[in-house]
């Protein structure tokens, strides 16, 4: 049996709160010359009762848009900044590849992954806080099996789509929501970005604006979130990406 002394640094006083609960298995792994300790924690939760639903649309230009039952809307993340950073990482990666600096490439990949995870943590925390502030009982997301086919993309952001993990963001949302007793459900994503929430006719948005012949107009991602809010819930909470 090996005893290991560890220094726990907790900038936001979150981990110390977790240590108050029942601790489980300790797992130690090595990544990029650093040792990482992971401890499972059992946290009791009380699922919220009620019928208030939050629809959340995930994307690239706008990382997330959420809308409540009473039509309160919140945008999360900065798609332009994310796109700029992805291009920056890609440019540096190309130069390192041409110079055959493999160790530097691995370090850059790790740095990019940490940055993306940090963005997803911030977005997921914002969504769950917004849900809590509005007494939401259920958060609804698109079923991730088909999100890559339904995400609004163009050739110039196709590379970003294939390197950004909607699956990870959904997991972060589900994890944080569970801690505060909010249920997460997944819905059929078919036509959520095309169906008019007012008259149910299907239309294609022009750039970022959705406009229907019935007179309804909204930001296209708000339309997606509105339709996700009341779309058909699918079984199994599929999260394959």
Regions found by a protein language model. Give the residues of each.
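Basic, amphipathic alpha-helical segments enriched in Lys/Arg and hydrophobic/aromatic residues
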Residues: 167
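Metal-dependent phosphodiester-processing active-site neighborhood
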Residues: 1-159, 170, 174-241
């Amino acid at each position: 049996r090996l005893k290991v002394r560890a220094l726990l640094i907790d900038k936001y006083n979150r981990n110390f709160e977790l240590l108050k609960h029942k601790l489980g298995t300790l797992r130690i792994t090595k990544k990029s010359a650093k040792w990482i300790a992971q401890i499972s924690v059992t946290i009791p939760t009380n699922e919220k009762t009620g019928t208030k639903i939050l629809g959340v649309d995930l994307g690239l230009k706008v990382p997330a848009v959420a809308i409540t039952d009473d039509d309160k809307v919140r945008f999360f993340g900065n798609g332009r900044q994310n796109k700029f950073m992805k291009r920056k990482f890609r440019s540096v990666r190309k130069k390192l590849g041409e110079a055959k600096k493999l160790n530097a490439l691995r370090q850059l990949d790790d740095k990019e992954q940490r940055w993306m995870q940090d963005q997803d943590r911030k977005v997921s925390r914002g969504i769950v806080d917004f849900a809590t502030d509005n007494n939401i009982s259920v958060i609804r997301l698109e079923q991730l099996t088909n999100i890559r086919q339904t995400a609004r993309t163009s050739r110039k952001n196709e590379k970003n789509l294939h390197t950004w993990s909607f699956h990870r963001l959904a997991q972060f949302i589900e994890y944080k929501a569970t801690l505060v007793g909010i249920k997460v459900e997944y819905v059929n994503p078919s036509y959520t970005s095309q169906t008019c929430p007012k008259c149910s006719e299907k239309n294609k948005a022009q750039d970022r604006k959705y406009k229907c012949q019935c007179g309804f107009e909204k930001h296209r991602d708000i339309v997606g979130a509105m339709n996700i809010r009341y779309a058909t819930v699918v079984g199994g909470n599929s999260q394959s990406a």
